[in-house]
A protein has these predicted regions:
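Predominantly five- to eight-bladed beta-propeller fold
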Residues: 1, 7-9, 91-147, 196, ...
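Non-catalytic accessory segments flanking enzyme active sites
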Residues: 1, 87, 119-127, 132-145, ...
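Short loop/turn segments that connect beta-strands within beta-propeller blades
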Residues: 4, 58-62, 150-154, 202-206, ...
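Beta-propeller fold detector
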Residues: 19-24, 65-68, 157-161, 209-213, ...
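Active-site-proximal cap/loop segments of hydrolase catalytic domains
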Residues: 25, 461-682
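Conserved beta-propeller blade repeats
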Residues: 27-43, 71-95, 120-122, 132-137, ...
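Structural motif
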Residues: 51-55, 96-101, 143-145, 191-199, ...
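Cap/lid segment of the alpha/beta-hydrolase catalytic domain
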Residues: 383-498, 502-504, 511
Length: 682
């Protein structure tokens, strides 16, 4: 959701404004729509010619013009304020720049030949950033580049001067006067290869200047110029000594070469920074920026999260500018804490928002019982899933409990089974989020509803290490320590105390970090009766050299450490060392092309389970041609099969065969008696 047309709430009336209509049906996919100021034309990306290109369409006449012809399409774009030109990001190979073929679209035949040639090409690797799970594998020599295109003449230009041919550039953004472009670049090699910096160049790509310097830029959304073009707002992860994880808006002053926070990282009464990462909610499509500046330059609007709610806040930039001390270090910012205002909040999950020139706001938001819909002024504009009204859905209860060490208040949620009956006990599943620096929120969870519909309760919560609860809550790598384990067990004990959960029939599951904690819990506690570990991390020592971020650690290698000492440090306390204590039925779900937690991590759990614990039911399901994000964006068949595997496992070992161990012991005794008989006969 890129922007809101001024005409969307014009004189045509409420009913006309709410009328849904299909704007494009030209390609297989269309995305990133942007309404021009006349309310008649719309820019968007369409792959009707094979790759995603920018089109401009007249919504009254349906006439359209293709603006770009990038060889491999456009990843994202932004129109200038005067709507005469656009800046784009595109993926290209070095030889395509050298041979001037960047703007030559390939025919299907040429593309097939090109892909075949690429498949045979050996990978040349010189940098640590050679693979990423989001790329679905290793890079094959491509880079992200930026350039411009004029809407009238369709003239396209690629920025290749001032080292920009060799430096990857992403998320370009126009200044309001159309003379400058801000973007994120990757200037480093080695272990810092994933670190981005903020850059500015002229509209023609000349006069490149680096603006940030190790400020912790989080380059997943475009930077934004202030109204007077004298500053740029970008998001940073502060380099705090306590190791806490909080994303904050930082204003870079282009006139004075200074920078400062725009909100106070110590004031957590309203929000915990900007956009605490949500734990894999039900979302689709490309995301727009989660922060936006008003046209008058007074306010910065941003999405935020606190205590399981995702809300919308704003901060006065001009007040912050006059009342904030200018600093040159990311850790020295001083700001008055009364600047942040809550704009929209409630028992909801605001996933996207857009504003028009009058600062009217449309949101995409969900809640526990409803997937995301469009909302405006407190009214729901769409109803995309009316079929849900035909099903009984389980509601959610929010609870708080004190941590075992008494140092924290813990938030957890409890989902009762559908058709819940009092005075009856039910099995339950503890679901652990990934991250770990994410937050479970009140959004629609199909997985939880599926478990509840089968007669199981669901327990989920935010143990220490989660975002949304302040810096102290997620400081010091606590998510990997005993505190997080204790917190998760505390969730279960608190839920069991409600009286309707059978403590002998509690299962546990989770993905990524949640899979790591699933393994850890069944190895170090006797609380659970069955487990499903998903896309798990098992051995942090081997993940150092196999995962796409294995070398990125919260505990960097001390200079005085030898490599062997470092690997031993990572291996110390590894969860596979507890495999002898894995005494519950275990299902392992893993994608074969997972580049974050490699498939070998699943094998390191499966193999010792079969060797050391042959009497324990253990099964591994591998999903081919899928990556770490399979349950969110994988093939639909695989997503359904993944859910079925998990639910079937818990139905079997928490409901149908909860006495499997007794039967196994009886069978073992019979086998032993038979062997003794054979020995006597022999």
């Amino acid at each position: 959701m890129e922007n809101l047309s001024q005409n969307a709430t014009g004189a045509e009336g409420k009913d006309a404004a709410r009328k849904e209509s299909v704007l494009t049906l030209d390609g297989i996919n269309e995305k990133q729509p942007f309404f021009l100021s006349d309310g008649i034309h719309m820019a968007y990306l369409s792959n009707e010619t094979g790759e995603f290109q920018v089109f401009i369409k007249n919504l009254k006449t349906n006439e359209k013009r293709q603006i770009t012809t990038l060889r491999h399409g456009v990843l994202r774009y932004q129109l200038s304020d005067d709507e005469t030109k656009l800046v784009f990001e595109a993926t290209l190979w070095p030889e395509e720049i050298q041979e001037n073929t960047a703007f030559e679209e390939m025919t299907p035949e040429k593309k097939a030949q090109w892909e075949e040639d690429l498949d045979w090409r050996p990978y040349e690797i010189t940098n640590l950033t050679y693979k990423l799970d989001e790329w679905h594998g290793m890079r094959k020599g491509e880079f992200s580049h930026i350039g411009t295109a004029e809407l009238s003449s369709k003239k396209q230009k690629l920025f290749t001067s001032d080292c920009m041919e060799k430096m990857e550039a992403i998320y370009p953004s126009w200044s309001h006067d159309g003379k400058k472009i801000a973007f994120y670049g990757y200037p480093y090699e080695g272990a810092k290869g994933f670190d981005v910096e903020l850059f500015v160049c002229d509209e023609n790509g000349k006069n490149l200047k680096q603006i940030s310097n190790d400020n912790g830029i989080y380059g997943d959304h475009a930077p934004a110029f202030t109204a007077d073009d004298t500053g740029i707002v970008a998001m940073v992860f502060g380099d705090f000594e306590d190791g806490s994880c909080v994303q904050l808006p930082m204003l870079f002053d282009l006139m004075n070469n200074t920078h400062r926070y725009l909100i106070d990282e110590w004031d957590e009464s309203i929000c915990h920074g900007v956009h605490p990462l949500r734990a894999g909610s039900l979302e689709y499509g490309d995301h727009s920026n989660y922060f936006k500046l008003t046209k008058d330059g007074k306010y910065l609007y941003f999405q935020t999260g606190r205590h399981g709610r995702y809300s919308l806040c704003r901060v006065r930039i001009d007040v912050a500018k006059s009342e904030t001390a200018e600093v040159s270090s990311v850790t020295d910012s001083v700001i008055k804490p009364s600047l942040v205002e809550m704009v929209l909040e409630g028992q909801t999950d605001i996933q996207e928002f857009a504003m028009n020139e009058n600062d009217q706001i449309v949101t995409i938001q969900a809640d526990w019982l409803h997937p995301a819909e469009l909302w405006m002024n407190g009214e729901k504009l769409t109803d995309s899933n009316p079929w849900l009204s035909e099903y009984a859905l389980a509601d959610v209860e929010e609870h708080w409990v004190k941590s075992k060490d008494g140092k924290a208040d813990l938030q957890y949620f409890l989902v009762k089974p559908v058709c819940f009956e009092k005075n009856k006990q039910y099995p339950a599943v503890l679901d652990i989020k990934g991250g770990p620096t994410t937050m479970y929120g009140l959004t629609f969870w199909h997985e939880f509803q599926a478990l509840a519909s089968l007669g199981m309760a669901v327990i989920f919560g935010n143990p220490r290490g989660s975002t949304g609860f302040g810096r102290a809550y997620c400081a010091g790598g606590v998510c990997w320590e005993n505190e997080a384990v204790d917190d998760l067990v505390q969730f279960v004990e608190a839920a069991v105390s409600k009286g309707f959960i059978d403590e002998k029939r509690v299962g546990v599951t989770g993905g990524s970090y949640g899979g790591y904690m699933t393994n850890k819990l069944i190895g170090r506690t006797n609380v659970f009766a069955a487990a499903v570990t998903q896309r798990c991390l098992a051995n942090t020592a081997t993940s150092y050299g196999t995962g796409d971020m294995g070398f990125v650690s919260s505990r960097p290698i001390p200079k005085h450490f030898h490599m062997l000492d470092y690997l031993e440090d990572r291996a110390r306390g590894n969860i596979i060392s507890y495999v002898d204590h894995f005494k519950v039925p275990l299902l392992i779900l893993h994608a074969y092309q997972d580049y974050r937690c490699g498939f070998e991590q699943a094998e390191q759990v499966f193999i010792p389970m079969k060797e050391r614990n042959p009497e324990i039911p253990c099964r591994m399901v591998m999903f081919p041609n899928e990556n770490h994000g399979m349950t969110r964006n994988g093939k639909l068949y695989h997503q359904v099969r993944h859910l079925q595997e998990m639910t079937n496992w818990f139905v079997k070992y928490l409901m149908e065969e909860s006495d499997w161990k007794t039967k196994a012991d009886e069978k073992s005794e019979k086998d032993t008696d038979f062997m003794k008989t054979q020995e006597v006969k022999g």
